[in-house]
């Protein structure tokens, strides 16, 4: 396998292209009036944006990048905050039976992205204070998109 493919519906192609170019750090390789495609070599990801008249609810829980260290988490957080995104930080949190350092950003259509580093395994699924990949979109009041 070369690429994992993910396609998401978006309302505004222009806003979404702008958001994902900043998040991924690459330009879209194909742009049409109702479609855009990004190819990331590391990780191998074929990510497409598909224009829809309306995007209701969150059809996926979230997306994320697992990185190798806390330093890498902080590097991406700093980079995206410089681009004007709001980053919701969760350090030393228990989520998905693991202790993690992470932050979250939200795309123009409400899809959440996490950048996380797994520090160790845990016997519990989540801490009460952690959003742990299950925050309903209606609970999110700040859109990180500029």
From Swiss-Prot:
It holds the Pfam family Glyoxalase. This is Probable trivalent organoarsenical cleaving enzyme. The gene is yqcK. CDD domains: VOC_like. It catalyses: methylarsonous acid + AH2 + O2 = arsenite + methanol + A + H(+); roxarsone (III) + AH2 + O2 = 4-hydroxy-3-nitrocyclohexa-2,5-dien-1-one + arsenite + A + H(+); nitarsone (III) + AH2 + O2 = 4-nitrocyclohexa-2,5-dien-1-one + arsenite + A + H(+); 4-aminophenylarsonous acid + AH2 + O2 = 4-aminocyclohexa-2,5-dien-1-one + arsenite + A. Its EC number is 1.13.11.-. Keywords: Detoxification, Dioxygenase, Iron, Metal-binding, Oxidoreductase. Roxarsone (III) binds at residues 95-96. It comes from Bacillus subtilis (strain 168). Fe(2+) binds at residues 5, 62, 114. The thiolates of the vicinal cysteine pair (Cys95-Cys96) directly coordinate the arsenic atom of the organoarsenical substrate. It is an enzyme of class 1 (oxidoreductase). InterPro entries: Cadmium-induced_rsp, Glyas_Bleomycin-R_OHBP_Dase, Glyas_Fos-R_dOase_dom, VOC, YqcK/CadI-like. Residues 2-118 form the VOC domain. One of its GO terms (biological process) is response to cadmium ion. Organoarsenicals are used as herbicides, pesticides, antimicrobial growth promoters, and chemical warfare agents. Arsenic is the most widespread environmental toxin and is classified as a Group 1 human carcinogen. The lineage of its organism: Bacteria, Bacillati, Bacillota, Bacilli, Bacillales. To M.tuberculosis Rv2641. Nonheme iron-dependent dioxygenase that can break carbon-arsenic bonds, playing a role in the detoxification of environmental organoarsenical compounds. Catalyzes the oxygen-dependent demethylation of highly toxic methylarsonous acid (MAs(III)) to arsenite, which can then be exported out of the cell. Can also cleave the C-As bond in several trivalent aromatic arsenicals, including roxarsone (III), nitarsone (III) and (4-aminophenyl)arsonous acid.
